């Protein structure tokens, strides 16, 4: 099982951390602000 070999384990952990960091950055910069604007606009429209 290559997942338990230390070299592959470190490789899997490092790439997993890298992918997680990139996805977190992309979602916080591009995806979440759009949902925030949508939520704010819907709350303003519903309060009219």
Curated annotation (Swiss-Prot):
Protein name (Swiss-Prot/TrEMBL): ATP synthase protein 8
Swiss-Prot/TrEMBL keywords: ATP synthesis, CF(0), Hydrogen ion transport, Ion transport, Membrane, Mitochondrion, Transmembrane, Transmembrane helix, Transport
Record's bilayer topology term: Single-pass membrane protein
Localization in the cell: Mitochondrion membrane
PANTHER family (UniProt xref): ATP SYNTHASE PROTEIN 8
Chief location bin: mitochondrion
A GO BP annotation: proton motive force-driven mitochondrial ATP synthesis
Keyword Transmembrane helix set for record: yes
Domain of life: Eukaryota
InterPro entries noted in UniProt: ATP_synth_su8_fun
Subunit structure and binding partners: F-type ATPases have 2 components, CF(1) - the catalytic core - and CF(0) - the membrane proton channel.
Transmembrane segments: 4-24
Statement: the UniProt record of this protein carries the keyword Transport: yes
GO cellular component terms attached to this protein's record: matrix side of mitochondrial inner membrane; proton-transporting ATP synthase complex
Protein species of origin: Schizosaccharomyces pombe (strain 972 / ATCC 24843) (Fission yeast)
Family recorded in the similarity comment: Belongs to the ATPase protein 8 family.
Any one GO molecular-function label of the UniProt entry: proton transmembrane transporter activity
Pfam families: Fun_ATP-synt_8 (PF05933)
């Amino acid at each position: 099982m290559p997942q338990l070999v230390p070299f592959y384990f470190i490789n899997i952990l490092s790439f997993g951390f890298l992918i997680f960091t990139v996805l977190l950055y992309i979602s916080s910069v591009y995806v979440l602000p759009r949902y925030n604007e949508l939520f704010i606009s819907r709350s303003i429209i519903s309060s009219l």
